[in-house]
Amino acid sequence: MIKSVIAGAVAMAVVSFGANAAASIPQGQGEVSFKGTVVDAPCGIETQSAKQEIDFGQISKSFLQEGGETQPKDLNIKLVNCDITNLKQLQGGAAKKGTVSLTFSGVPAENADDMLQTVGDTNTAIVVTDSSGKRVKFDGATETGASNLINGDNTIHFTAFVKKDNSGKNVAEGAFSAVANFNLTYQ
């Protein structure tokens, strides 16, 4: 009888081990990659803000031809984890707030550095305006108005819209695209 009990215990251990071994077999797998960039700046740029895509959808050719402008789309640049302690300085006895301004670069439309030329032979252009409605220039040198910063997260607001370019040609059907780059300057 003792042999039967020992044999039963051994059999149970083997079955139990087999069940546990089967449960630990991977039933799916994946990979997580991590990346980033350390910058010498008071703020980081949120990933979604660093590379954005704005889709204007389908736009009526006749609407643009008659001087229409699409509904503005938000173009927000979110700055994260800002530490503006070193930006604040005494200037004339008063504390100066930390600020940021931007420059935009791209291919300006013909005779208009405040319009971004599109690619695609549609004779359209993109206009970007700051929060006060002032058009930004795509010359890579003209700074936008300075925005005050706080410690933590900050969002710089712009809008973008499409209109007929200044080429004098009729708006044509087809797909278009454009790329603008921005640079930050902290003060």
Curated annotation (Swiss-Prot):
GO terms for biological process: cell adhesion involved in single-species biofilm formation. It comes from the Bacteria. Gene3D superfamilies: Fimbrial-type adhesion domain. Disulfide bonds join 43-82. Its main location: other. SUPFAM superfamilies: Bacterial adhesins (SSF49401). The keyword Cell inner membrane does not apply. One of its GO terms (cellular component) is pilus. Pfam families: Fimbrial. Keywords: Disulfide bond, Fimbrium, Signal. Belongs to the fimbrial protein family. Fimbriae (also called pili), polar filaments radiating from the surface of the bacterium to a length of 0.5-1.5 micrometers and numbering 100-300 per cell, enable bacteria to colonize the epithelium of specific host organs. This is KS71A fimbrillin.
